[in-house]
Regions:
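A conserved acidic beta->alpha catalytic loop
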Residues: 44-53, 73, 99
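Conserved donor NDP-sugar-binding/catalytic core segment of glycosyltransferases
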Residues: 107-139
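Glycine-rich, basic loop-to-helix element that forms the pyrophosphate-binding segment
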Residues: 71-90, 111
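Acidic helix N-cap motif at the loop->helix transition within catalytic regions
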Residues: 22-24, 49-58, 103, 107
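C-terminal subregions of glycosyltransferases and related glycan-biosynthesis enzymes
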Residues: 2-5, 182-185, 189-193, 197-303
Length: 303
């Protein structure tokens, strides 16, 4: 077995905004990793709950392992902008993204490092995930395509990466990686779609290496109509500026997505998204039942 110093350093970066209810299991899951050569860099985006107090306690216990960057004013630019601040401090060969409300399985870092070490041509690796609710009960799974070619083909119709499962190399084509902040949301989708079009290879491991938490306040499920417009702009940009060529089926799927998202209430859209990802135990608002029956056959096209 290699000594700790011989293993590649992993920089785990975690943006935090008002995540006090879930911070303890999230941080503990990183501290409990079987892979020990890592640093944890947390950016607190001016949280107004008890996040700062929780983080201060961890900093006292692990002063060398954990770095806390506290912003005094909320940047209102999302987690990816905060992640860029963490990246400026990162020393690792590999970067692992972690969200403050999720739980990493103990072998996550070990398996992702092993994959990147044995696949030098792959820039990024992610995994599948179990989906849990606010109290930690499993309510479904998030399953994504595994190979680079499958990910490339499906990127136009949905985001085939679970962001908090991803680990990637510190550099892309000789330059330090950073998130490309261009839109009000969806900048991870924009960044990784751009890298994919620029020759980056991605992969997903079949194992479920995190518990992805849905608790009603996830940024992913807020303002979904607005985010779809951003996504549409990104897709068009990839065609016009990056040379991406979607299949006819992908174009048709995007049109169906547009019709559904424009015409249905946002609450129904969210539940359809849950269904499309196999999250079958999420609760449905009473007014959503009838529309869901009408469009249920089209769920698989939401991506």
């Amino acid at each position: 077995m290699k000594h700790l110093q011989e293993l590649p350093l992993v920089s785990v970066i975690m943006p935090v905004y008002n995540a006090g209810d879930f911070l303890v299991p999230a941080i503990d899951s990183i501290l409990s990793q079987t892979y020990k050569n890592f640093e944890l860099i947390i950016v607190n985006d001016a949280s107004t709950d008890n996040s700062a107090t929780v983080l201060a306690e961890y900093k006292k216990k692990y002063p060398r392992l954990i770095t806390i960057i506290s912003l005094t004013k909320n940047r209102n630019a999302g987690g990816d902008a905060c992640a860029n601040i963490a990246l400026e401090k990162a020393r690792g060969t590999y970067i692992a993204r972690m969200d403050a409300d999720d739980v990493a399985l103990p072998s996550r870092l070990e398996k992702e490092v092993a994959y990147l070490e044995s696949h030098p041509s792959v820039f990024l690796v992610g995994s599948n995930a179990s989906v849990i609710n606010k109290t930690g009960n499993t309510i479904g799974d998030k399953l994504e395509p595994l190979t680079s070619s499958e990910i490339y083909q499906q990127y136009f119709t949905f985001h085939p990466l679970i962001h908090p499962t991803t680990m990637f190399r510190r550099e892309f084509k000789g330059k330090p990686f950073s998130y490309r902040i261009k839109y009000s949301a969806n900048n991870d989708y924009y960044t990784f779609f751009s890298l994919l079009c620029e020759g980056g290879k991605f992969a997903n491991l079949p194992e479920k290496l995190i518990q992805y938490r849905i608790h009603g306040k996830n940024d992913t499920f807020v303002h979904m109509k607005k985010k779809f417009i951003n996504t549409l702009r990104i897709r068009i940009e990839m065609i016009l500026k990056k040379g991406y060529r979607p299949s006819p089926k992908a174009v048709l799927t995007t049109l169906v997505q547009g019709v559904i998202i424009i015409t249905l209430p946002e609450a129904v859209i969210t539940q359809l998204y849950f269904l499309s990802k196999g999250i079958t135990k999420a609760s449905f608002p009473s007014f959503a039942t009838k529309p869901l029956l009408i469009v249920k056959q089209k769920v698989s096209m939401l991506g």
